[in-house]
Amino acid sequence: MIEGLDWIVIVISLAISLGIGWWAARKNSGDTESFFLAGRCMPWWLLGVSMVATTFAADTPTLITDWVRTEGVSKNWLWWSLVFSGMLTTYVFARRWRRSGVMTDVEFYELRYSGLGGQILRAYRALYLGLFFNVFIIAVVSLAAIKILGVLMGLDAWQTILLGAGVTMLYSVVGGLRSVLLVDCFQFAL
């Protein structure tokens, strides 16, 4: 169970995360591109750290540890296979996406594919990612956090969800993508 000094470190790290959100909000110029894309001026290494930090959420290490424990080291190939698509996205597609000036992948598909086929692809991506994939990922991360914080802090499911979602939504809504990237970097360093 977590003791006094642990609580102090947790409260300070949450306060720093919120502080980063407020600082990022002051840096944003108030337009859509500044909020959703951080003005398109973030350094490549910060974007990379954010991507890596995202895979270090409570769910991924827990899942991979379980895979190795139950099925052996060879099960790592399941997630190692994603390295190729990640590298392709980073070094080939990201440059083209940036050059096109779009904000979202659906907007990119709108430029690339027209007609009924393009509409079907955009609708599929919006429904699949918006209603299935993202909801599933958030549920898995939340379940991992509920289990971990239940043991470490004695929090029940609702307390964990309200605390985690509350802090995350606050710094995200206040500071936009700039805030998310900087908080990811801070939490990765922790």
Enumerate the predicted regions with their spans.
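Membrane-interface helix-loop-helix modules in multi-pass membrane proteins
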Residues: F36-M103
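Interfacial loop-to-helix junctions that mark the boundaries of transmembrane helices
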Residues: M1-V9, R69-W80, L149-Q159
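Short amphipathic alpha-helical coupling elements at transmembrane boundaries
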Residues: S34-L37, E107-S114, A126, V151, ...
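Small-residue-rich segments of transmembrane alpha-helices in multi-pass membrane proteins
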Residues: M42-S50, Y113-Q119, Q187-L190
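Short helix-coil transition sites and intra-membrane helix breaks within transmembrane domains
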Residues: W23-K27, T54-D59, R96-S100, N134-V141
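Short helix-boundary/re-entrant hairpin motifs in multi-pass inner-membrane proteins
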Residues: R112-F132
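Transmembrane alpha-helical segments of multi-pass small-molecule transport proteins
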Residues: I10-I12, M51, V83, R122-Y128, ...
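Membrane-interface "cap" regions at the ends of multi-pass membrane proteins
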Residues: M1-P61, S172-G175
